[in-house]
Design a protein with these regions (language model features):
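N-terminal helix initiation/capping motif
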Residues: 1-32, 95, 99-118
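Short, charged beta-turn/beta-strand-edge "cap" motif at the junction between a beta-strand
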Residues: 56-60
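A residue-level detector for short acidic-glycine micro-motifs
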Residues: 18, 31, 70-72, 85
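Short, mixed charged/polar active-site loops
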Residues: 24-26, 61-65
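Short strand-loop-strand
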Residues: 12-54, 78-80
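Short solvent-exposed strand/turn elements
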Residues: 6, 12, 43-47, 81-99
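A short, polar/proline- and glycine-enriched secondary-structure boundary/capping micro-motif
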Residues: 37, 51, 64, 90-95
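Short, compositionally biased
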Residues: 66-76
Length: 118
C-alpha cells in the first residue's frame, strides 16, 4: 500500500463516467477505498482539479455520485482522487460497495454497464 494513503484500497473493476474541465469521459475504477479511488481513463486532468463522477452500483441500476480532488495523474493512463464532501447517503453506498468488494476475494469486484448519459 502506498504510504500516502490513510485507508487501504480494494481491487475493483467498476464502470464509471467522470466530468472535469475537459468534459464527460468514460473510465474504469480499478481500486477503491473509503477515502478515494483510481480511475483508468485517457482523459486529461490537472493535479488539484475537482472532478465529479459516478459509479454503477450492483443489482439496482443506481449510481453512486462522488466528487474528488485529483491527487496524482499519469497522462494517458488515469488518475487518483481523494473524495471530497461525502454526505451520509454517499458514505453508506460506498461502504456497501467496499463490503461487496472485500467479500469477492482476490479477484477484482466487477460491475459493467452501458455508460449512457442520464
Amino acid at each position: 500500500m502506498d504510504e500516502r494513503r490513510s485507508k487501504p484500497r480494494l481491487n475493483v473493476s467498476l464502470d464509471a463516467v467522470w466530468h472535469g474541465e475537459t468534459g464527460r469521459q468514460s473510465a474504469r475504477v480499478t481500486d477503491l477505498s473509503e477515502g478515494g479511488c483510481y480511475l483508468d481513463t485517457v482523459g486529461e486532468v490537472m493535479k488539484g482539479e475537482i472532478v465529479a463522477f459516478r459509479i454503477l452500483l450492483p443489482d439496482d441500476d443506481d449510481w453512486l455520485y462522488l466528487e474528488g480532488e485529483v491527487r496524482h495523474h499519469r497522462p494517458g493512463f488515469g488518475f487518483g482522487v481523494q473524495f471530497v464532501d461525502l454526505n451520509e447517503e454517499q458514505t453508506d453506498k460506498l461502504s456497501m460497495l467496499l463490503r461487496l468488494a472485500n467479500e469477492s476475494g482476490p479477484e477484482p469486484f466487477a460491475i459493467s454497464a452501458d455508460l449512457v448519459e442520464e
